[in-house]
Amino acid sequence: MRITRNSIETNVGPAEWFTGGVFIDAVASPSDGSRLHASSVHFTPGARTAWHTHPNGQTIWVTEGIGLCQRRGGPIDVIQPGDRVFFEPGEEHWHGAAPNRFMTHVAIVEVDEEGNPATWGDHVSDEEYAAAPAVEG
């Protein structure tokens, strides 16, 4: 057993991967044969990921606020606290906060054999993001 006492350092989401203010608290990192990676990710209103994929899929669990998510070619869905979204391995997608709401989710992935959790693509354009359904605020 290992207890890690309140020592999480918040990191700013890199501009190459995110649009807007995003803050990441690592919860679990791969170690000792485990390939599990989990983070609590905090999005300011309008902030979002770039298009990306995960080699072994990704689960996000919304814990606060209102968010949006979309797989390439699909509709933009509104997600709320308690919602869980699973993105299939290799499925191109994005997720983030609604325009007028903060959103926090726990992101869980299994890294690949080289330790990579994701492959990042282009930023979600303002036009793509603006196609989201209205969210009451």
Predicted feature locations:
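Short, conserved beta-strand element in jelly-roll/cupin
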Residues: 40-44, 53-69, 108-111
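A short, N-terminal "cap"/entry segment at the start of jelly-roll beta-barrel domains
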Residues: 1-36, 117-137
